[in-house]
């Protein structure tokens, strides 16, 4: 695999004041150039900021975190290409056919991004993308030794 596409829940957890030990250990062990974000995760993070009322004490802190993420991952923030959009359509349609439920757009877009870039999708929401065909790694539960780069 070519690296790790980090889901928003992973980004939020490692950016917090006290990330869980297992997650922090895994994250720190990864080569920086193997860690990637999707522009969709940045949008989700921004959405979370916008949920906070204007003047909320945490707004500024989260805005600063988002800026640090954009700077840290510069050159490793993946956009949504035509190939990713088409892959998402295939995944979304197949998952709905199999499960009779519409999957989360963002989660399946991240799965499509990981597939198109040959990456693992690092997420806590493994069940949400179980039928996507993506190689999914849950850093809270899975053994990293089973997911070689």
What positions do the PLM features span?
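Active-site neighborhoods of divalent-metal-dependent phosphate/nucleic-acid chemistry enzymes
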Residues: 47-52, 71, 75-120
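Residues that scaffold the ATP/ADP-binding catalytic core of kinase and kinase-like folds
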Residues: 13-14, 26, 48, 87-91, ...
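Alpha-helix capping/helix-boundary segments
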Residues: 10, 41, 84, 110, ...
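Short, well-structured N-terminal submotif of metal-dependent ribonuclease cores
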Residues: 1-41, 50-68, 143-148
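Short secondary-structure boundary/capping segments
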Residues: 2, 26-28, 68-69, 77, ...
């Amino acid at each position: 695999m070519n690296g790790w596409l980090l889901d928003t829940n992973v980004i939020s957890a490692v950016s917090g004041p006290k990330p869980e030990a297992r997650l922090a250990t895994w994250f720190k062990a990864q080569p920086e150039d193997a860690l990637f974000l999707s522009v969709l995760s940045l949008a989700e993070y921004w959405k979370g900021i916008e949920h906070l009322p204007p003047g909320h004490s945490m707004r500024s802190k989260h805005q600063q975190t988002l800026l640090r993420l954009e700077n840290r991952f510069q050159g490793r923030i993946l956009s949504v290409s035509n190939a990713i959009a088409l892959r998402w359509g295939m995944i979304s349609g197949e998952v709905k056919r199999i499960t009779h439920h519409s999957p989360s757009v963002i989660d399946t877009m991240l799965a499509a991004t990981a597939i198109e870039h040959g990456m693992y999708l690092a997420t806590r929401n493994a069940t949400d993308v179980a039928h996507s065909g993506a190689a999914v790694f849950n850093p809270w539960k899975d053994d990293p030794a089973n997911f070689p780069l």
